[in-house]
């Protein structure tokens, strides 16, 4: 009969941990759903005031080989989306930042490398190869979920997320100054 209390304890602990894990997973899924609703709503709206900066030096601090641009999508004074486009000598980087109440909630990041032609041993600037996509989900300025399509970049997702938070704040200031 001494075994009975131990069995009850095991079942109780199993129930507590299973319930807590399920609740945590459900909370995360709800947050992901909310973020998806936010960026779908932002992308479906069509009457934005768009502020464009075509001088990469203004937002990157230096020019790039193939230029760059920064676009801010505003409704009134409220910034909803930023699109950063950077053309480097060997690739193109595009990051889309999505905001809810001036707080970063999502980043969609894409990198495409210029195709390398083995025959001519040069880059083909007419063709791009998709090399990276990343989806970063934020809650209260913390990364809580990500989908990364590149094993090497998956290792740096926390650093990438921190960089996105810093960039989003810097870009927000720059674009707001241009709006006025």
Which residue ranges define each predicted feature?
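Buried hydrophobic residues that stabilize the cores of well-folded domains
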Residues: 24-87, 91-180
């Amino acid at each position: 009969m001494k075994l009975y209390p131990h069995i009850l304890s095991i079942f109780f602990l199993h129930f507590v941990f299973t319930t807590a894990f399920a609740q945590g997973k459900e909370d995360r899924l709800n947050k992901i759903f909310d973020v998806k609703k936010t960026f779908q709503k932002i992308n479906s709206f069509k009457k934005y005031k768009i502020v464009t900066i075509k001088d990469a030096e203004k937002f990157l601090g230096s020019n790039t080989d193939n230029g760059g641009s920064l676009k801010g999508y505003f409704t009134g004074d409220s910034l909803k989306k930023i699109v950063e486009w950077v053309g480097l000598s060997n690739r193109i980087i595009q990051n889309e930042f999505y905001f809810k109440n001036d707080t970063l909630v999502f980043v969609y990041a894409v990198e495409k490398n210029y195709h390398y032609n083995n025959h001519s041993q040069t880059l083909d600037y007419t063709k791009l190869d998709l090399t990276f996509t990343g989806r970063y989900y934020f809650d209260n300025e913390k990364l809580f979920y990500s989908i990364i399509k590149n094993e090497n970049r998956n290792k740096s997702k926390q650093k990438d997320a921190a960089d996105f938070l810093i960039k989003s704040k810097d870009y927000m200031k720059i674009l707001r100054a241009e709006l006025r």
